[in-house]
Amino acid sequence: MNDNLKPADIVREEKAQLDFSRAMSYGDYLHLDAILGAQQPLSPAHDEMLFIIQHQTSELWMKLMLHELRAAIANVAQDELGSAFKKLARVSKIMEQLVHAWDVLATMTPPEYSAIRPYLASSSGFQSAQYRCIEFALGNKNAAMLKPHAHRPDLLALVTAAFEAPSLYDEALRLLARRGLSVPASHTERDWTQGYVENDAVESAWLTVYRDPKQYWDLYQLGEELTDLEDAFRLWRFRHVTTVERVIGFKRGTGGTGGVSYLRKMLDVVLFPEIWKLRTDL
């Protein structure tokens, strides 16, 4: 090994491909021209670039999250739990990534945000179609949340499909019923567009699983994957609240909500209630 090699010598020695006139390059594969050209600040403020990239990268992570969630829901519906577990674990890690992403936006100070806020008009993360699909896939159904997408038939179709489909938890309960556990028909054959209502019989079914993990190991693991997922989702929401409060205080959000007050209320939403309640009753 020659420790005196210069960088140019290393590239030559490794025979790295340098000519892409007739081959697909890294930028070609990733369509980087389109991605890196998508940041179009409207204000003269230096910090608007941070604001745009924060939200664009979050949307990319949410695209992957939806890709994994939809596949995981299909896996659970088909009793393919091994495949579902891998995807749900990945979703939890994506949420962890998004939690840390708030640390970057938190470097924006109130005066810096105030300089760009007038240029945002009524645009808001509240209107994110992908985030709404994630909430619907996790069971937080609310018909009013379709309205922000009514002006875009393509987006309306996307969120409506998620709204009308069984959620991850719906499919988990149907799986428990297929395995012979006593889950009421009111929770396995219901109107999927309605919000989930906590049920004692559902908790009893989960308690059966948690009292005998050895017999119901894969269902027990499913319960813990759901717990991990909601735990990660809560942290993501909480970090959103604290970042918004740090940057804008209690001003109303650009989307018309109360801002921090709205986000704090959303922290109280429980997605998989029986899995949390059984920990007290076990």
UniProtKB/Swiss-Prot annotation:
Its cofactor is heme. Substrate binds at F51, I52, I53, Q54, H55, Y113, R117, T254. Binds 1 heme group per subunit. One of its GO terms (biological process) is L-tryptophan catabolic process to acetyl-CoA. Heme binds at H240. It comes from the Bacteria. Keywords: Dioxygenase, Heme, Iron, Metal-binding, Oxidoreductase, Tryptophan catabolism. Pathway: Amino-acid degradation; L-tryptophan degradation via kynurenine pathway; L-kynurenine from L-tryptophan: step 1/2. It holds the Pfam family Trp_dioxygenase. One of its GO terms (molecular function) is heme binding. InterPro entries: Trp/Indoleamine_2_3_dOase-like, Trp_2-3-dOase_bac, Trp_2_3_dOase. Gene3D superfamilies: 1.20.58.480. It catalyses: L-tryptophan + O2 = N-formyl-L-kynurenine. Its EC number is 1.13.11.11. Homotetramer. Belongs to the tryptophan 2,3-dioxygenase family. Heme-dependent dioxygenase that catalyzes the oxidative cleavage of the L-tryptophan (L-Trp) pyrrole ring and converts L-tryptophan to N-formyl-L-kynurenine. Catalyzes the oxidative cleavage of the indole moiety. NCBIfam families: trp_2_3_diox. This is Tryptophan 2,3-dioxygenase. It comes from Polaromonas naphthalenivorans (strain CJ2). The gene is kynA.
